[in-house]
Amino acid sequence: MEDAQESGECLVQNQKYCVERPIYNQEILQGQLHKRERTPQSLRQKIEHSCRCSSKKAKSHLYSFLPILKWLPRYPVKEYLLGDIISGISTGVMQLPQGLAYALLAAVPPVFGLYSSFYPVFLYTFFGTSKHISIGTFAVISMMVGGVAVRQVPDEVISVGYNSTNATDASDYYSLRDDKRVQVAVTLAFLSGIIQLCLGFLRFGFVAIYLTEPLVRGFTTAAAVHVFTSQLKYLLGVKTSRYSGPLSVVYSLVAVFSKITTTNIAALIVGLTCIALLLIGKEINLRFKKKLPVPIPMEIIVVIIGTGVSAGMNLTESYGVDVVGKIPQGLSAPAVPEIQLIPAIFIDAVAIAIVGFSMAVSMAKIFALKHGYTIDGNQELIALGICNSVGSFFQSFPITCSMSRSLVQESTGGKTQIAGALSSIMVLLVIVAIGYLFEPLPQTVLAAIVMVNLKGMFKQFADVAHFWRTSKIELAIWVVAFVASLFLGLDYGLLTAVAFAMITVIYRTQRPQYRILGQIPDTDIYCDVEEYEEVKEYPGIKIFQANTSLYFANSESYTSALKKKTGVDPCAILAARRKAQKKHAREIKKANKVKKKAVLKLVNSSTNDVEASVKHEIANDGLPANGKFAFVDAGVQDGSPDELEHFVEPKTNVHSLILDFAPVNFVDSVGAKTLKSVIKEYNEVGVCVCIASCSGPVMNELTRLNFFDNTVTRELLFHSIHDAVLACQGKDRSASQTALDH
């Protein structure tokens, strides 16, 4: 620390920044520079270049599409294999209970959660670029899927024709309802995967930037409330319908509390016990993270205990506790998704595709930054698209990255995608061999697992205080995303949040910060005069800066702020001058009338001596001898047009205005017209307008928009603020000297 301080002191004391050069405006600078010759490619040439394929290019594309071909041959077995095995087993142990639990969120039978924890996870090993994220079921995506499934296949529709209390009829009812909801979930996976593939191949990975961190955190916090609410009925063991769409949270809470008296005490005790065990286990893992070789797999422990207790005490028959039920052994045959459902679920699929990608790529970037490698956002889109679309043929619902499993996979020593492949193989063993053992598992245990896993998301409520301190606009985005997603549903809430986030971008460009800059003495550095005491303005020169681009949405506010900040309003000055000139003209006219009346009156007097005396007095003093008329100044007596023309009061003490264009990234046609109008208006009142630090792309845009002409030339554009200041000072001195000479 001391060395750094000494180095800083040496830098201040010993190093100088001395530059002596001419003052550069763009006209002079461009005259001294020689542009490189650039021949733009035609569309045909671009197509030919993109279609040309050499062996090197083909190999590069193949490695890009299948990253496993690049890293697997170089896999250091001795260094990485043990860590990947431990990590794969630890993650697989979490995949199993979470797959079963999140299937309930997706409104499908639990076995489909296992399918979704196997096929996509295994496929990601070949196509993904992140070494540490754990692909599979995730609460938010599962909740979105469940909302669509319930909307498309509500209980009321299926219940028609099943009014019998016969057990066989009830079984058929649930079977038919679940089959239809599975079709919706599978088709969602297929469609969202196709959308992700299209975005990936079209290199549209940047769409994730529109889901900003405050938006995603507000959205996921609302999703956590949705998920928690949906699990209350399983925890309490009450029978209620599942709701989707606007106000579904309210309806769900009303339905649960209206049947609170029918709570299954056995289910509640089992659920609360599991919640307590899971919270204790997570706290132990957190406190002793450095001492434990691997985290304690409390979720699978709770599942095993819950299954054993349920089977041993026969909770279903004795206490009416709902259990997972039938888990088919083995993999199901491939099936084509229901294509006819696509029009009804397309918007939902777009939302799921983008949210899923955003979750995965944000988590992947965190681990990539931590471990020093890069990920390809477009390839991640392709990988997720393949996982979802191919997995849909094997009855898996949409998946993405799970934050909790990814943290476990990374913290337990996972080095590559091999860990993910091993976790999927563990799920496969359960599907083909021992899945039936989990049939007695109480649903309240799965609800407990889901609820405890929401702990991290509920901690995001602390974001409100954080964003209140740092950024009110980001706080507004968080609140809108949360409230809209909570009450309008996750689909409409997400659309509302994205729309609001876009509006805030427009708002920020419409309401930027405007500053008047001044010089730090004896430097070429210019800062805000209101922020620093040492900063001084040059007499007669105003330097105006707006930290935004100039376009149609803010051009009016730009000119308003310019007039307000500089204190120079050309329209007001011209209006004041016209008013003063009119008043001056009226005074001259009135004085001429008085003069004429006085002369006529004196001409009619009877005494020639008096007449001569009066004429003499008028010629010398401009007043009648009797003194009945007010004195008229000699300058006002002469109402000649020449004197009126040279009357330019009131004046402004500003002779030059410099617009700092360093923050300006682009200018559109409206902005260019506004800028040109500003220059001409200020010129009319004798204020010279210059533009400083204009970037090359903005210069090119101004040229394309025909901004420059005989009155607005490139001589008004300067390389830096200091160039413009020196030029304005020199011009003012020349003008003052010329005025003195005349």
From Swiss-Prot:
Cytoplasmic side: 1-76, 128-138, 203-212, 289-297, 374-376, 413-416, 471, 511-742
Keywords for the protein's UniProt record, in alphabetical order: Cell membrane, Glycoprotein, Membrane, Metal-binding, Transmembrane, Transmembrane helix, Zinc
Superkingdom assignment: Eukaryota
GO MF terms, alphabetically ordered: metal ion binding; oxalate:chloride antiporter activity; sulfate:chloride antiporter activity
InterPro entries associated with the record: S04_transporter_CS (IPR018045), SLC26A/SulP_dom (IPR011547), SLC26A/SulP_fam (IPR001902), STAS_dom (IPR002645), STAS_dom_sf (IPR036513)
Known function: Electrogenic antiporter that exchanges sulfate or oxalate for chloride ion in a strictly coupled manner with a 1:1 stoichiometry. Adopts a dynamic conformation, which alternates between the exposure of the central binding site to the extra- and intracellular solutions leading to an inward-to-outward conformational transition during the transport cycle.
Similarity comment text for this entry: Belongs to the SLC26A/SulP transporter (TC 2.A.53) family.
Name under which the protein is recorded: Prestin
Naturally occurring in which organism (per UniProt): Gallus gallus
Gene: SLC26A5
